[in-house]
Amino acid sequence: MNTEASQDQTVTETPGVRLRQARESLGLTQQTVAERLCLKVSTIRDIEEDNAQANLASTFHRGYIRSYAKLVHLPEDELLPILEKQAPVRAAKVAPMQSFSLGKKHKKRDGWLMSFTWLIVLVVLGLTGAWWWQNHQAQQAEIANMVDQSSAQLSQNGGQPVPLTDDNSDAIAPTDAPAPVANGQPVPLTNHSTSAVTNSATTSSATTSSVPTTSSVPKTTLVPKTTLVPKTNSTEPVDTANTNTTMHQEGAASAAVSPSQVPQLGMPTDQPPLPTADAGVSGSASSVGALVMNFTADCWLQVVDATGKTLFSGIQKGGAVLNLAGKAPYKLTIGAPGALTISYQGNPVDLSKFIKANRVARLTVGVE
């Protein structure tokens, strides 16, 4: 009877009861145990009442009991078997792992999408390159056609790069035209000026003995080597002219003066000098509708005015200056827009958009 009573007493003593008895024997309160174990008072109370928290894992619950047993000096081997009988270990719920084949399907689909994306990118790049190449070939063919046309026109015109019509013969004025020369001396006299000298020689002997000086001629003026002898009935001697001619021959050998700078013999001082090539250039450049082009490199050019007449068609060398005048507006076709600068009536013409696009320039200048 005593053995059965002791077994019943052992079974009724749960881990919570034994822990409470040990705590009370040491004179500790639940608050003191909670502070030493760094737990809540409610957790200590649940352990002594053998209440397992539903949201607390069994592993943590066993750990709390072990710490409590060490604090009140109880052996763990006596409490753990009782605890296993009272609250068996619950199996942890583990979520089933996804199949490896599912991950492979995702990777396969992602790889297919990436391949399709790269294919689209390559197609777009290929189309862009083909479009650029076609435009480039078209521009090169157009430039080659223009050059062939220009070469054909040059061969037809005998090597002259500027074919002009009769109405526009003064459109291009030569800037470096030399003065006519005879026997090493400039010949500024025309038929009109020669007759003027002849008539003046009959009226005054001072005209043949001295040359009038203007502001544009230095004091050592040139005198022609040959003496002009007027064909008149005058009996005035010409020895004075011969003497003056001999005196000035030494100065005439070392100086060269253009016809526009030396006044005509026998002409009045208030008569204006004869026009030169420079005056023609300035007049055409400053006229209304003037078109001036400065070339920095070789360039093919074609200029057509409003009447449909071709003012210029050909290749200009670098460093050349082209002055054109016709009826505005002008239609220009330029093979290399970056090789020249254009000004119309003194205002520059913008060619930047053609230079950036690197293509043949077709524009109209002088549109009001």
Swiss-Prot record:
Bias type Low complexity, positions: 193-221
Cleavable signal peptide: none
Region (Disordered): 151-243
Membrane-side (Cytoplasmic) residue stretches: 1-111
Top-level lineage group: Bacteria
Gene Ontology CC: one annotated term: plasma membrane
Periplasmic side: 133-368
Ranges of the DNA-binding region feature: 30-49
Domain (HTH cro/C1-type) ranges: 19-79
InterPro entries: Bact_Cytoskel_RodZ, Cro/C1-type_HTH, Lambda_DNA-bd_dom_sf, RodZ, RodZ-like_C
Keyword Membrane appears in the UniProt entry: yes
One GO process term, biological-process aspect: regulation of cell shape
Transmembrane segments: 112-132
Similarity comment: Belongs to the RodZ family.
The protein's name in its UniProt record: Cytoskeleton protein RodZ
Source species of the chain: Yersinia pseudotuberculosis serotype O:3 (strain YPIII)
